[in-house]
Amino acid sequence: APEAVAGDVIIELNQKGGKQKIKWPLYNRRLGNGTQYAQGVTSSDFIDLIMVDRFSNGDMTNDQVKGMRDQSLNRKEMYDRHGGDLQGVINNLDYIQGLGVTALWFTPVMENDMAKRTEHGYAITNHYKIDARYGGDALYEKLSDQLHKRGMKLIFDAVYNHIGSFHFLELDPPANDWVHRWPTYTQ
């Protein structure tokens, strides 16, 4: 809204056993309402879709993160994690740009704390956090800045029509009919 003022917005989420507050900074508007900074994807862009876990492992220290459910790490197994991360993408930006790529699109990189099959990113458990196994929020911001310095674009893929079984909206839905449920597996 035009009357919005810069400052911290507090988003309050009701959960079993209490409330969770998330502080979200609202910054001053960019000149031209962002049109001088952000450029949308057009038909002239060459988009490269990358499944980050399968691309390049630039930081082996985040391959297995203590406390996360999926500790698999085996490049020989199709459904295990392979260790690719955002640092691996950053390390290969010259190569990617050399291919003529103008925009990067990743399969979802938000936290996907499921017990297995987390390599694809489509069972998000936290829409507010970049998965630590990819390098986390700060590294995602660094990648975004580096792409923009190169005149490249970043497409953020977020899935909102389904969530992982450990997402707070699955564990503590705001209403009983919030998520469709069937007595048996349905395909």
Indicate where each model-derived feature is located.
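Extended acidic/polar, glycine-enriched regions
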Residues: 1-40
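Substrate-binding/active-site clefts of carbohydrate-active enzymes
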Residues: 45, 53-187
